[in-house]
Amino acid sequence: MQVILLDKIAHLGNVGDQVSVKAGFARNFLIPQGKAVMATQANIEYFESRRAELERKAAEVLATAQARANQLAELATVTITSKAGDEGRLFGSITARDVAEAVTAAGVEIAKSEVRLSTGPLRTTGEHQVRFQLHGEVFATLNVVIVAE
């Protein structure tokens, strides 16, 4: 199935590229999320007339993500308190939602879907490196310190 991309998609293409994808991927993901449209003749002509506007919009989204990454870099560390045992193991765990709430409370708006916990939920006290994917190509890291209550 031929689609025209309205957003940059990793391993697929950039804004305006006409690519061939499987029908299910287009119908169930790309088109409902507003990341692509079917490559009909009418859509191709319409897209060509709006190409500059869509590219400008994509550049604004990228600039916003980079600004948020700079804010995260300035933040340096975020501290989260949680109940823990004597050996430093938490009663429960710190999830992506908890990290997102702590960073948002510190002044940088982050959604839980942007938090990347590579080893799963954090289960021990101490300092942990947390990675954030703010855009398809904008990443940031932040030290999260977990202290016992």
Curated annotation (Swiss-Prot):
Single GO molecular function: structural constituent of ribosome
Keyword list, A-Z: Ribonucleoprotein, Ribosomal protein, RNA-binding, rRNA-binding
Keyword Ribosomal protein (UniProt): yes
One Gene Ontology cellular component: ribonucleoprotein complex
Mitochondrion among keywords: no
Domain of life: Bacteria
Gene Ontology biological process terms, A to Z: translation
Functional summary from the UniProt entry: Binds to the 23S rRNA.
HAMAP family, A to Z: Ribosomal_bL9
Protein family according to the UniProt entry: Belongs to the bacterial ribosomal protein bL9 family.
Designated name of the protein: Large ribosomal subunit protein bL9
